[in-house]
Regions:
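Short acidic/glycine- and proline-prone juxtamembrane loop motifs at membrane-interface regions
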Residues: 126-134
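Aromatic/acidic, Gly/Pro-rich catalytic loop(s) in extracytoplasmic/lumenal soluble domains
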Residues: 421-481
């Protein structure tokens, strides 16, 4: 029998678990260091810009929602962490809703919880990857819409898909690979092909386009700002294209293995213990597992094609988070069908232990100097006041330093390390790395006529003793005349 989708009771329990996770994350974050992490500091500082159609190379959705939460609940570390952990929880929640369209409640719960065995989701996203977090949540929301539509063909699923496409398109550019690979996977399966010919799907594209049209118009009109981080791809010169592309493919392979090996290893262990059991998946569940596998294969193939066509010499593991969840579901769903009830409970217990272990490890890491959260921002602010009179200057710097100073001294003129525009008087520049060529940084800041003073190395205080320093490099920039 075809699953009827999640019941209200199942949705209620899933949401309750999400609330528990958010509460646990918040309690541990507030208990492990008062300073902002790098991504937290970025959001804190960018809030000065207010609502805009574009924020340089970053897509706007994360900022819009975070700034809205600041407006409603006030600007605090708690609000930043609640939004972050809510996105983490929603990623699993949406995965459960999507999987529940084809498999039972227990299998869909355990498969969705298996995301905790992906390093980029379980660990890296907890500390950084702000915009990747919201992309992953909206990728799963898109998965819900696809799965719901493939099961029922309902108009509500098409509307959901359109909204998910529009919001996802405002999260990160690699989000667009999600609907592409899901469409390719669905078209490759005869049971789903008829649904994909439904002309009502054009409505989803119209809804999505209506949501993204204004921000994408800003991107078209401001290409320099929008492409400011393209150097991350390490694009080659024509004469080195082949070798750089090979390096990029090696990088992609390396990070794909890093992203999937822990889960592959765990699946192999469990499969060895239930090899004698018959795979008792119902036909719909079997087709859905194939759908997930083909979507993952399409995603990885698109990533390879991108590296080859662009010549990108660098690839990062979290860029694959549009595809790795589907690979996880494709691995876990067939395994769950072969497991006994006891083995399923063990799998669930391991997922719970992984959540607890990850949160505990993060708490230890966050509170261990020179971890970013252990910075004594008040002591740093006092030092800058005494040395440079920073309270009377415009302070620009890397997000980490500037964000923490803006939080500690809200009355200061603190800005990101970008061209500052109109400034009255001198500028105090703070960087995490030494500036070897002050003339170059002045040109980049569009302060070509300014002069740079002597670089001063400061050693900020941390709230606990540390054997390792995290220096900050300071310079006074003086206007001409």
């Amino acid at each position: 029998m075809r699953p009827a989708g999640p019941s209200r009771r199942e949705i209620g329990w899933a949401l309750l678990l999400c609330v528990v996770y958010v509460a646990l994350s918040l309690a541990l974050r507030l208990a492990t260091g008062p300073a902002l992490e790098v991504d937290e500091a970025e959001v804190w500082l960018q809030a000065q810009l207010g609502y805009a159609l574009g924020y340089g190379p970053q897509f706007p959705l994360y900022y819009w929602i975070q700034f809205g939460l600041f407006d409603v609940f006030g600007k605090s570390l708690a609000v930043v962490d609640i939004f972050r952990s809510t996105l983490m929880a929603l990623t699993v929640f949406f995965a459960f809703l999507a999987l529940r369209q084809a498999v039972g409640a227990m299998s869909s719960s355990l498969a969705a919880a298996s995301l905790i065995f992906l390093p980029d989701y379980a660990w890296v996203s907890q500390m950084t990857l702000t915009h990747t977090r919201i992309m992953a949540a909206l990728a799963m929301a898109t998965f819900v819409a696809f799965a719901w539509f493939l099961r029922t063909g309902r108009m509500a699923a098409i509307v959901w898909l359109g909204v998910a496409l529009g919001l996802g398109g405002l999260s990160k550019p690699n989000f667009w690979l999600v609907p592409i690979m899901l469409s390719l996977a669905a078209l490759s399966i005869p049971a789903y092909r008829a649904r994909m010919r439904d002309k009502r799907l054009l409505l989803a594209l119209v809804i999505g386009a209506a949501i993204v049209v204004a921000p994408y118009g800003w991107i078209i009109l401001h290409p320099t700002e929008a492409l400011a981080s393209i150097n991350k791809l390490a694009l080659p010169k024509p004469e080195t294209r082949m070798i750089v592309t090979l390096i990029g493919l090696f990088d992609l392979t390396k990070w794909a293995l890093y992203a999937m090996l822990p889960l592959v290893f765990l699946v192999a262990i469990f499969r060895s213990f239930c090899a004698h059991r018959t795979d008792d998946r119902p036909p719909d569940a079997e087709v859905f597992a194939q759908f997930c596998m083909r979507a993952a294969i399409a995603g990885f193939a698109i990533a390879i094609l991108f590296v080859v066509l662009s010549g990108a010499g660098q690839f990062k593991s979290h860029w694959l988070m549009f595809a790795t969840p589907f690979a996880a579901f494709a691995l876990v769903l067939p395994l769950l069908a072969r497991m006994s009830l006891l083995q399923r409970r063990i799998w669930g217990a391991l997922a719970i232990l992984a959540v607890i272990g990850t949160q505990t490890s993060l708490a230890v890491q966050r509170g261990t100097p020179p971890a970013t959260q252990a910075l004594d921002a008040e002591a740093l602010a006092q030092d800058l006041e005494q040395r440079f009179g920073a309270d009377r200057l415009t302070v620009i710097g890397d997000f980490y330093w500037s964000g923490n100073l803006a939080r500690t001294r809200p009355d200061w003129d603190v800005r990101a390390l970008t061209p500052p525009g109109s400034v009255d008087g001198e500028i105090l520049m703070l960087t995490k790395l030494p500036i070897q060529s002050p003339e170059g940084i002045l040109r980049w800041l569009k302060l070509g006529e300014w002069s740079a003073g002597q670089q001063v190395v400061l050693t900020p205080a941390f709230i606990a003793p540390s054997t390792e320093d995290r220096p900050v490099f300071a310079r006074i920039l003086t206007p001409p005349g």
